[in-house]
Amino acid sequence: MSHEDCIFCKIIDGELPAAKVYEDAHVYAFLDISQVSKGHTLVIPKVHTKDVYDTPADVAGQLFSVVPTIANGIKKAFQPAGMNILINNEEAAGQEVFHTHIHLIPRYGTEDDGFKAKWETHNDDYTKDDLEDIAWKVAGSMTCTR
């Protein structure tokens, strides 16, 4: 997707409306139109990057540096019982708009708050050696971007 076709880039450029929550030189945050729960906010970099894999470390740092401020604003405004903070990367993980974005989803402790993430444990499937092998493969595959 090019910058010209990106709905989030159009929001940043003022071509499409959005309920803005926060803006600085590098980051823009606005309410998700779906409002999975009241206060559901998206935090995006102003520079177009497809997903976290495509995002330079400095841009990621700018993006994540404002998350606590926005999360605390949501907490103060609505007193949620908790909050999920997540990024969907690529279609298989649920990414629908291919511009890096962080979801801040307030949770109100009710079954109908709109978000249904649940992890199933597989700890019995992995030995200590399996975990060490997985960690070694991940660590050996990383490229330092600092």
Which functions belong to the PLM regions below?
Residues 1-146:
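HIT superfamily nucleotide-processing domains
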